[in-house]
Amino acid sequence: PGLAAAIPAPPESQEKKPLKPCCACPETKKARDACIIEKGEEHCGHLIEAHKECMRALGFKI
């Protein structure tokens, strides 16, 4: 565990392929998913919103 964080991801913004929603905002997605699993969706609104804001900042319309 923790090894993936040590490997820098290739800069996807410079490629011509659009970023897929599943790959965008991994930090907020991980925190959101962990919270939902542990506490239930109704207790994780702040993390869900943070992930949505990150996605919107990358141009996703959600």
Swiss-Prot record:
Post-translational modification: Acetylation by KAT8 promotes assembly of the mitochondrial respiratory chain complex IV (CIV).
Matching InterPro entries: Cys_alpha_HP_mot_SF, Cyt_c_oxidase_Cu-chaperone
Pfam families assigned to the protein according to its UniProt record, in alphabetical order: COX17
Phosphoserine, modified sites: 13
Modified residues (N6-acetyllysine): 17, 29
Transmembrane segments: none
Main location per the UniProt record: mitochondrion
Similarity comment text for this entry: Belongs to the COX17 family.
Cysteines joined through disulfide linkages: 25-54, 35-44
Domain CHCH positions: 22-62
Motif (Cx9C motif 2): 44-54
Task of the protein: Copper metallochaperone essential for the assembly of the mitochondrial respiratory chain complex IV (CIV), also known as cytochrome c oxidase. Binds two copper ions and delivers them to the metallochaperone SCO1 which transports the copper ions to the Cu(A) site on the cytochrome c oxidase subunit II (MT-CO2/COX2).
Keyword Coiled coil: no
Protein name as catalogued: Cytochrome c oxidase copper chaperone
Compartment(s) where it occurs, according to its Swiss-Prot or TrEMBL record: Mitochondrion intermembrane space; Cytoplasm
Chain location of the short sequence motif Cx9C motif 1 per the record: 25-35
Native species: Sus scrofa (Pig)
One GO term (biological process): mitochondrial cytochrome c oxidase assembly
GO cellular component, one term: mitochondrial intermembrane space
Binding of Cu cation, residues: 22-23
Entry keyword Mitochondrion: yes
Gene Ontology molecular-function annotations: copper chaperone activity; copper ion binding
Subunit structure: Interacts with COA1. Interacts with the chaperone CHCHD4; this is important for correct folding and the formation of disulfide bonds that stabilize the structure.
